[in-house]
């Protein structure tokens, strides 16, 4: 059985491959030795650049509390620099939800089953 770190890394790599298969240039950002990183992936396509943090979730709710302070600071600076909205890619059961950062920030906690519009393949990311 994989530990949480390996499960997370596996999903980050999977998400990078999914984006690459959809024509994005996607790059996994390696964590620093202390484990910190601003977000997990950067993806670029047709002049759009996306910052994406990948999370796995075993229950049906996802909370803003799952984002670390350095990730929130990085997303806020990303936006101040005039970039597109960052996303949190959440894997739950067999689905991936692409949750816009501002949506999670405004709602604090979301029930994943209520986000059918954010499922991978539905949201035009």
Which sequence ranges carry the predicted segments?
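Mixed-charge (Asp/Glu-Lys/Arg
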Residues: 73-76, 107, 124-125
């Amino acid at each position: 059985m994989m530990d949480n770190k390996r499960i997370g890394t596996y999903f980050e790599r999977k998400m990078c491959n999914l984006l690459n298969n959809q024509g994005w240039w996607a790059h996994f950002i390696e964590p620093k030795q202390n484990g910190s990183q601003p977000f997990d992936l950067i993806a670029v396509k047709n002049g759009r650049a996306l910052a994406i943090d990948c999370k796995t979730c075993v229950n049906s709710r996802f909370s803003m509390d799952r984002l670390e302070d350095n990730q929130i600071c990085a997303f806020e600076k990303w936006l101040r620099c005039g970039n597109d909205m960052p996303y949190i890619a959440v894997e739950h059961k067999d689905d991936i939800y692409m949750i816009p950062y501002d949506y999670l920030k405004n709602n604090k906690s979301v029930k994943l089953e209520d986000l059918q519009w954010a499922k991978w393949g539905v949201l035009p990311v």
